Amino acid sequence: LEQLAAQARWWKMLPQAGTAILVCADMTKGEKVKDEMHLSGCNAAIQNILLAAHDMGLGAVWLGVCEGSDMEPPVRQIFHLPDHIRVVGMVAVGHPACAPQQPASGWIFPFGTKSSGK
């Protein structure tokens, strides 16, 4: 995690998070479909990881590792990834440093059900 944290200023929390999940697509597997299908599946998996972490009382954040970005080569090197593996994203998971925010039910209301005070 220390090696990853050194790669981008937005990743400095990684050592404190305790866990990082790297989400990748094997571009040789599955049907021969456009790359977007692999990305869609990985993005859905990342969203499910975020939801599961929240359900377990953990904090989680989606960290982008875009193909062609400055962060991709060091990530590929740290994890020794072959060329056919495409890095889609990373999720830092750990115990949150602060209390969760107020639930959305406290500040989101269906149209017309909360008076504007006028």
Residue ranges of predicted features:
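Acidic, surface-exposed loops and disordered segments
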Residues: L1-K118
